[in-house]
């Protein structure tokens, strides 16, 4: 019985394809890549901070990300640092930082992602990687010189597939008084159209969606409620993990381990539903807030906080509160014993998890769908944090917490949703998609064409 199957098509995103090629060279243990590893994003940030601190310790943290982005831009454009003229002091600073950064990478046998791509290009040229008979490109608006060079070296036949577009006579322009009015009109229009025909696909493109995410979400929700329309809405913009309720509560609890916290941070924890404080009565928490405010302090240590909120007179309320706050009371000794030491990043990850459990995180009640996804993302965040063990160093609490907070700020939480009739998208997310009806917000000269971001170091 002879049976045949189709071979799986080799369809890749550009990053996936380049990673596949790099893995192929690594599997061969080819001389081009032997003994080399690609530096990860968090490792890179650490090395940039160290490289900048050698010249300017005061600004090492604030310039690390922009220095990394600058190097990425140069390497994507196939430019070396020597090709950048020394016309400004910023360029001179960057060149010194880069020299220190390269020394750190070389010492640890690491390369940047773009340098790994350059080695992939050499792999195609020397025959270590087999060429494809043809490569078809689809959906590329522009390709940086480095990836374009690699693609051309991977095949003698490279063609771009063009999207077929049809002219639309139903396009019209609407002028509004201001941006808020246009967002409200777009939301009402989408809700009305879905009420008339629920199975159509409608898109609203907002160029700066990340800057007005909460406003758009509120207006769309109000419009759908007004029309009595129940439909799934997909908003493509994500939220920084540090700003999600569950992760923010976890970081706030871990922050207790630091010497002092502001009154606002303590009150945020006091009323959080994601920790043991939620088991306290509303009256107790209200009295606790008033007692803390009466002290006229701007910040509190853990001992000062507990002294301020626990009633001094014996009562049933005091006994009930002491029972709930016992893990926090015991923490005074625990924190002194445990936080003064140096640990690996995985050691701190285990410590943080060990600490959060008795603090009642993420709360007693069952998590809803969004909160459950945030909990899963937290676990992934901790895994990324543990990957910093590759640095081969041990750090104190403040450094460990700084890296964890940094990861949480840079990681984006976007809860997965099914294909929704109403899609709220940014410009990049909306490119190439098809809709039955589409509203593009803010079609004026300030948004189209998009302004070029100027690199302050170049």
Predicted regions and their residues:
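Polyanion-engaging groove/track-forming segments
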Residues: 1-458
């Amino acid at each position: 019985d002879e049976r045949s199957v189709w071979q799986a098509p080799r369809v890749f995103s550009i990053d996936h394809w380049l990673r596949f090629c790099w893995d192929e060279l690594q599997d061969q243990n080819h001389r081009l890549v032997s003994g080399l590893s690609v530096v990860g994003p968090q490792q890179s940030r650490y090395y940039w901070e160290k490289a900048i601190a050698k010249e300017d310790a005061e600004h090492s943290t604030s310039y690390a990300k922009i220095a990394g982005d600058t190097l990425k831009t140069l390497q994507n454009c196939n430019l070396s640092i020597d090709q950048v003229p020394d016309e400004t002091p910023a360029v001179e600073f960057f060149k010194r930082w880069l020299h220190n950064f390269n020394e750190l990478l070389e010492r640890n046998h690491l390369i940047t992602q773009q340098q790994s791509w350059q080695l992939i290009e050499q792999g195609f040229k020397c025959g270590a990687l087999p060429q494809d008979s043809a490569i078809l490109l689809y959906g590329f608006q522009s390709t940086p010189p480095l990836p374009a060079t690699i693609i051309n070296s991977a095949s003698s036949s490279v063609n771009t597939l063009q999207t077929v577009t049809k002219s639309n006579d139903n396009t019209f322009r609407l002028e509004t008084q201001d941006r808020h009015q246009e967002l409200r009109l777009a939301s009402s229009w989408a809700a009305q159209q879905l009420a008339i025909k629920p199975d159509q696909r409608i898109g609203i493109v907002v160029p700066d969606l990340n800057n007005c995410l909460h406003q758009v979400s509120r207006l769309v929700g109000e419009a759908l409620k007004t029309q009595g329309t129940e439909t799934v809405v997909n908003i493509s913009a994500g939220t920084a993990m540090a700003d999600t309720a569950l992760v923010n509560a976890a970081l706030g609890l871990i922050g207790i381990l630091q010497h002092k916290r502001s009154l606002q941070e303590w009150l945020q924890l006091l009323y959080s539903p994601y920790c043991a404080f939620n088991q306290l009565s509303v009256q107790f928490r209200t009295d606790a807030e008033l007692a803390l405010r009466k002290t006229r302090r701007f910040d509190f240590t853990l001992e000062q906080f507990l002294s301020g909120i626990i009633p001094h007179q014996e009562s049933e309320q005091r006994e009930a509160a002491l029972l709930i706050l016992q893990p926090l009371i015991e923490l005074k000794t625990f924190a002194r014993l445990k936080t003064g030491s140096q640990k690996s990043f995985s050691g701190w990850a285990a410590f943080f998890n060990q600490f959060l459990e008795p603090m009642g995180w993420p709360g007693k009640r069952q998590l809803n769908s969004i909160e459950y996804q945030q909990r899963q993302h937290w676990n992934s965040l901790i895994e990324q944090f543990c990957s910093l063990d590759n640095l081969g160093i041990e750090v104190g609490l403040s450094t460990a917490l700084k890296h964890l907070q940094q990861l949480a700020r840079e990681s984006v939480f976007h809860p997965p949703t099914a294909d929704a009739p109403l899609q709220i998208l940014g410009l990049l997310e909306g490119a190439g998609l098809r809709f039955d009806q589409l509203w593009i917000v803010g079609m004026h000269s300030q948004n189209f064409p998009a302004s070029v971001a100027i690199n302050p170091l170049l």
